């Protein structure tokens, strides 16, 4: 068997692998709390991926920043040139999956989360950004609330990927892997929450 020459991926593989990586990192937290960093980074990437999949609608325009989507449509109508595609901001994608106007098939949406989901997605985004754009400083992150934030995010992903028809999984294995990773990660986070409360 020859060695691969390329790393191949796509939007579904990215979302599922990021979710699986968050689950792998969460299992290490009991021995080393620093793994929370990698859970937040991977879970942010996975949640963003699931929202992108849910908003794809056959052309991906809803996933782009509004000005870019408008320029893309204009270029399409006029035969080009096409703009560089830029994914919309994380919290804008979240607002879009909560907007009924963005879903046109039965059972696809919108996500009707609770206020805690809004707070948790905002917190996930903030913490992830602190890690990704880390400035010179000392920083302490209280562990007690972290499992709850992640559980809320997983509820969004479970709804988008398993309970609604928003995501069209073109490989059944992606759906199965996502379901398994969500279930395992929820279990791990619930155990971590109990430890934080003890």
Segments and roles (model prediction):
Residues 2-108:
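Amphipathic alpha-helical interface segments
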């Amino acid at each position: 068997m020859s060695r691969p020459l390329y790393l191949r991926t796509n939007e579904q593989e990215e979302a599922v692998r990021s979710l699986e990586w968050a689950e792998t990192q969460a299992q290490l937290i009991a021995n080393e709390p620093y793994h929370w960093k990698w859970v937040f980074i991977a879970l942010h990437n996975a949640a963003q991926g699931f929202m992108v999949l849910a908003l794809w609608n056959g052309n991906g325009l809803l996933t782009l920043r509004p000005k870019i989507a408008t320029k893309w449509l204009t270029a399409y109508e006029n035969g080009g040139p096409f703009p560089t595609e830029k994914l919309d901001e994380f919290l804008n994608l979240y607002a879009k999956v909560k907007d009924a106007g963005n879903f046109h098939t039965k059972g696809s949406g919108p996500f009707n989360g609770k206020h805690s989901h809004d707070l948790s997605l905002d917190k996930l985004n903030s913490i992830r950004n602190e890690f990704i754009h880390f400035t010179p400083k000392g920083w302490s992150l209280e562990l007690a609330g972290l499992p709850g934030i992640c559980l809320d995010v997983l509820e969004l992903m479970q709804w988008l990927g398993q309970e609604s028809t928003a995501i069209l999984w073109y490989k059944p294995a992606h759906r199965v892997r996502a379901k398994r990773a969500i279930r395992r990660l929820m279990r791990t986070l619930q155990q971590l929450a109990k430890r934080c409360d003890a």
